[in-house]
Amino acid sequence: MNSPVSCALTPDQVDRFNLDGFLVLPHRASPATCAALAAAAGEQLQAHIPPLEYEADLGYPGAPVSRAAEGGTTVRRLRGTFGRGAVFRDWAFAPEVCEPVRQLLGAPLYLTLTHHNAVMTKHPRYGTATGWHRDNRYWSFVQPQLITAWLALGPEDATNGALRVIPGSHQVALAPGQLDALSFLIEAHPDSAALVARATEVSLQAGDVLLFDSRLF
């Protein structure tokens, strides 16, 4: 009888997360799990089952100007993923993702059902980039010890909008006026150039999990 595979992180992985503010865990979800999640998300995307976030509603650079415009019904996110079916809930509670997050936090886990309870659906033509930001701008918790878990359902690289992060930026104290009214980093600010110069792309394969501190850019 085979022993169960541990989902725990090594001390080196914990140290790297604490230093860089993010950590890639390869092959955390099986091909079958990724296929089931992608199929369920695709069906709901095709049917435009709410709640949804549309590119046109956000108005980021390059987005359709309205829902009536060409590409105006392009969906950016399937929101409320936890309530969209058992396949999503099963993954949310999977030890492959819960155990390392619990280990990094050193505290009981709580799953937030607000902003990041979602499937990102980046469209090749109408999908838009998001400016540099920290995820904790979306939340109002007293303590900032929050971790986002991102599961790649397919390959993510420079050709299709892979995430970019700034290693160590979760520990950076910003200067006054370095964020705009929506808490996006003002890249023209004198103190931002050196920060953005450290940015790196996070390439992922289907099944890889990216964990990152909510204070990371």
Language-model features: where?
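Active-site region of the double-stranded beta-helix
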Residues: 107-110, 136, 141-144, 151-162, ...
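A structural signal for short, well-ordered beta-strand segments
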Residues: 117, 149-151
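A short beta-loop-beta micro-motif enriched in histidine and acidic residues
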Residues: 134-146, 197-198, 204
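A structural signal for well-ordered alpha-helical segments within the folded catalytic domains
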Residues: 95-99, 147, 205
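Non-heme Fe(II)-dependent double-stranded beta-helix
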Residues: 1-20, 26-132, 138-139
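Coil-to-beta-strand transition motifs
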Residues: 127, 144-146, 209
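Double-stranded beta-helix
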Residues: 2, 156-217
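Short, solvent-exposed loop/turn segments at secondary-structure junctions
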Residues: 30-31, 119-121, 137, 156, ...
